């Protein structure tokens, strides 16, 4: 009779599962190779029964980083897989799945009985992904307990992600109350968007989000810092207690002023250095008047034009 817990039926979540798949198709083989290796402490799949008179099948063993439900394992590996809770050690399962010497996939390493794997697994994830965010998502408890050590390891490992792309820069200009911040909020998934704290140099809470919003900007970042943010080269930004790599693919700058007004012409050597980094200029249809959101619309300009008589994005 299926076990029940919290009103749910079916096998309880486990870390270690074995599975068999008879007569696998190429699509089914591909699916079994698709799950990211960061899911597993150890994963092995052998191909068996290819000689005449036997049923071709895949024989696999998965030791997941964290417990998985029966249905989740089916989702990862394929609905036709026959799945059971694993018995024996990782090494014994490795020997069983590889007994015919024809492996479809093997990743990770067999775990020993009682082996401490939380920190070592988090380290493996970190060195594989180069991302503290990935570690935090997959190993939250270990991340909280070992954040500083993991951060230092990332710095000295050479695995830290670095920007090697041009960050797109979108400037949204309009009077107060026209909906600039709403425009920025709707640009991308909130999960991947970081709102820069205003009027200071700190980037506390930034963890490599792909979209950065600099809201209500009027020149309060140092000129050189703004140019570096809007460029294409590796950059780290300061947090209270350390630095993090800047990995934004898009920067949204909202302002009541045009870029012409952000900095004094006597304070910057060549304002064109900023203009050529701007990807697009989005203006309220009449940015010189106090308008409500219902009374106008945002328009993407094609500079040089009357509203902004300088070339951009070159």
Curated annotation (Swiss-Prot):
Cofactor: Mg(2+); Mn(2+)
SUPFAM superfamilies xref list: P-loop containing nucleoside triphosphate hydrolases
Source species, domain of life: Viruses
Motif (RCR-2): 57-59
Entry binding sites for ATP: 174-181
Motif Nuclear localization signal boundaries: 4-18
Example of a GO biological process term: rolling circle single-stranded viral DNA replication
GO terms for MF: ATP binding; ATP hydrolysis activity; DNA binding; endonuclease activity; metal ion binding; nucleotidyltransferase activity; RNA binding; RNA helicase activity
Gene3D superfamilies, sorted: 3.40.1310.20, P-loop containing nucleotide triphosphate hydrolases
Enzyme Commission code: 2.7.7.-, 3.1.21.-, 3.6.1.-
Motif (RCR-3) on chain: 96-99
Designated name of the protein: Replication-associated protein
């Amino acid at each position: 009779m299926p076990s029940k817990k919290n009103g749910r039926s079916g096998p309880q979540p486990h870390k270690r599962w074995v599975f068999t798949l008879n007569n696998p198709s190429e699509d089914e083989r591909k699916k079994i190779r698709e799950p990211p290796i960061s899911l597993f402490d150890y994963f092995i799949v052998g191909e068996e029964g290819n000689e005449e008179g036997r049923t071709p099948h895949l024989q696999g063993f998965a030791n997941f980083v964290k417990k998985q439900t029966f249905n989740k394992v089916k989702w990862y590996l394929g609905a036709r897989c026959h799945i059971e809770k694993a018995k024996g050690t990782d090494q014994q399962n490795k020997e069983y799945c590889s007994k015919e010497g024809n492996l479809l996939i093997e990743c990770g390493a067999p775990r020993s009985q009682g082996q401490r794997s939380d920190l070592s697994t988090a380290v493996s994830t970190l060195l594989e992904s180069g991302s503290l965010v990935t570690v935090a998502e997959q190993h939250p408890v270990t991340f909280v307990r070992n954040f500083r050590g993991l951060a230092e390891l990332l710095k000295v490992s050479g695995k830290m992600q670095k920007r090697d792309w041009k960050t797109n820069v979108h400037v949204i200009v309009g009077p107060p109350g026209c909906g600039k911040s709403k425009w920025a909020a709707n640009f991308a998934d909130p999960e991947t968007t970081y709102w820069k704290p205003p009027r200071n140099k700190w980037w506390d809470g930034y963890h490599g989000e792909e979209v950065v919003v600099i809201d209500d900007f009027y020149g309060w970042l140092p000129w050189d810092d703004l140019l570096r943010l809007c460029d294409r080269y590796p950059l780290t930004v300061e947090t209270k207690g350390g630095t993090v790599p800047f990995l934004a693919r898009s920067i949204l700058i909202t302002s009541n002023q045009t870029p012409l007004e952000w900095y004094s012409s006597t304070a910057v050597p060549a304002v064109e250095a900023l203009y050529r980094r701007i990807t697009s200029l989005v203006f309220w249809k009449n940015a010189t008047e106090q308008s409500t959101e219902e009374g106008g619309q945002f328009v993407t300009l094609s500079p040089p034009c009357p509203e902004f008589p300088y070339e951009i994005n070159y």
